[in-house]
Amino acid sequence: MLFNYQSLLVGVSLISQALSAPILESRATADAAAFPDLHRAAKLSSAAYTGCIGKAFDVTITKRIYDLVTDTNGFVGYSTEKKTIAVIMRGSTTITDFVNDIDIALITPELSGVTFPSDVKIMRGVHRPWSAVHDTIITEVKALIAKYPDYTLEAVGHSLGGALTSIAHVALAQNFPDKSLVSNALNAFPIGNQAWADFGTAQAGTFNRGNNVLDGVPNMYSSPLVNFKHYGTEYYSSGTEASTVKCEGQRDKSCSAGNGMYAVTPGHIASFGVVMLTAGCGYLS
């Protein structure tokens, strides 16, 4: 959500500030060891905003992802350093993205290679942009698996890109059930009902939610009026190893659920020591 930041702050606040937070508990524990992977995920997420060509840090880009109608944007590639095949999704930069961010109408998802339970519902504003590029991404990942059969899979994104990552994780897990998979969704809002969260939780692989202090976006749509549900393991940080904690459950008050914020806030543009759009592409690293 980097498009016209002030407009986003006002527009999303109108939707979400009126929502009350659920009951919270505090159980987070220090986990500095998680920081390096989340910092790398933040750099790759920033690179998706930058529009890197050829390479983004350790990832060699093999396919740019773009759909004109939905403005879905990102890239697929591989890392010889990490021995992984990566799907990286960009967050919001345009009016089209912003419209997707606030389109919370629930729909029944349909994606090739994915068998959804009948009661799963997700927001149209995330399903529509992902479904526009789903087949392209799965085809490219399949081709890379053929070239690098021993590589693992990963999905990464920030904000709307993080919300798309929550679908990417399910899509990759279902289409490639024999592959090891780790996904990192940064500063993302929840996108579906409890059945969706249960389905995401049931997938093979590891799904992490990385959140920044003073960011209200992870709390959007999570309170009783909308009642969307997160899944995965949350990590919370002010941008350093020492401040990184592993949260317990989805409503740990030591983490994003307890910061009292329910909209786009200044803390949203940073993640695990990286300010989005400022990290470059790693060409000189």
Swiss-Prot record:
It is found in: Secreted. The keyword NADP does not apply. Optimum temperature is 30 degrees Celsius. It is an enzyme of class 3 (hydrolase). It comes from the Eukaryota. Optimum pH is 10.0. Its EC number is 3.1.1.3. The active site is at S159 (nucleophile), D215 (charge relay system), H268 (charge relay system). The keyword Lipid metabolism applies. This is Secreted alkaline triacylglycerol lipase.
